Amino acid sequence: MQYIAFDAHKHYTLASVATPDGQLVREERIEHDREALRQFLGRCERGSPVAVETVGNWYWIVDEIEAAACIPKLVHARKAKLMMGMINKTDKLDARGLNRLQRNGTLPTVWIPPGALRDQRDLPRTRMVLVRQRTQLKNRIHATLAKYALHDLEVSDLFGARGRALLRQRLALLPPHTAYATEHLLEQIESLDRQVDGF
């Protein structure tokens, strides 16, 4: 068995491979390309644990580790940094530190959801982004109406059926360019409504 640690970045990973007694076998920079990672993992002992920090691109890296019959260990990055206590950080020191924590049995890991669940999690995350965008657009329309003292509509929901009818009437009272921009914001909100309903 070998201990493998990945200090992953956006475009590359620095890999460190060590023996159970801590002897460094090799360190290698791997460009973020599936084939390059497969080739690297193909030279590693099957069943070896691979520590990977929870950076934004860990999904595909974990998939490749599993496909290579190695054991992914998803690291809680902040806790690991505290435990390593390094002041002068470098990629090599990070990877070596992760391996040291693995060998000591103190590597702070988090649960790795199965691939199907990771995929499903994108649905609520995307819905949340769309809802946030819609809220920003609604707030902008509220601010536009307030700028021109047209915000005194007698409705509880400006973007409900009755509120939108009143809002379209108020658009005629806005200056032409502002009305044009607000109409486009309203169209975006309607488009986002349909998209959010699809989730």
Indicate residue ranges for each PLM-predicted region.
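A detector of single, family-specific signature residues
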Residues: 1-199
